């Protein structure tokens, strides 16, 4: 067997089982940039940007449907990603529909048509009826 190079002879094996991920140079500089110097040379911490999610709404719906059931963080992240994806698809389709008819405003009609195009059959019908109900409730000002 050939001898190991001198540079790796004294090092421990490269096991990553219990190690945290190694930060790259870009990540190190990004983490350092969170601190900016103030007027007196003191260091100020930047506020964390808030990540907007649908998790509180998903949780409320879960408790309405199954009051005794919980949800893991991973499942919540998947559902949040799903909601973002569906909303993005509907918005993109509604934008295309508005541009086809040379309109600069997306109305409830474009949203409804987008839902019909994106969601399959019965799911689209239920989504449209619930959406219409919500818009009517909002317009009337009732809780």
UniProtKB/Swiss-Prot annotation:
Residues bearing PTM N6-acetyllysine: 11, 19
PANTHER family listed in its UniProt record: HISTONE H2B
Superkingdom, taxonomy of origin: Eukaryota
CDD domains, per database record: HFD_H2B
Main localization category: nucleus
Name of the featured protein: Histone H2B
Gene designation: htbA
Signal sequence coordinates: none
Keyword Aminoacyl-tRNA synthetase set for record: no
Compartments in which it is found: Nucleus; Chromosome
A GO molecular-function descriptor: DNA binding
Keywords assigned by UniProt, alphabetized: Acetylation, Chromosome, DNA-binding, Isopeptide bond, Nucleosome core, Nucleus, Phosphoprotein, Ubl conjugation
Complexes and interactors: The nucleosome is a histone octamer containing two molecules each of H2A, H2B, H3 and H4 assembled in one H3-H4 heterotetramer and two H2A-H2B heterodimers. The octamer wraps approximately 147 bp of DNA.
Organism encoding this protein: Agaricus bisporus (White button mushroom)
Record carries keyword DNA-binding: yes
Annotated Low complexity bias: 23-39
Function: Core component of nucleosome. Nucleosomes wrap and compact DNA into chromatin, limiting DNA accessibility to the cellular machineries which require DNA as a template. Histones thereby play a central role in transcription regulation, DNA repair, DNA replication and chromosomal stability. DNA accessibility is regulated via a complex set of post-translational modifications of histones, also called histone code, and nucleosome remodeling.
UniProt crosslink position (Glycyl lysine isopeptide (Lys-Gly) (interchain with G-Cter in ubiquitin)): 137
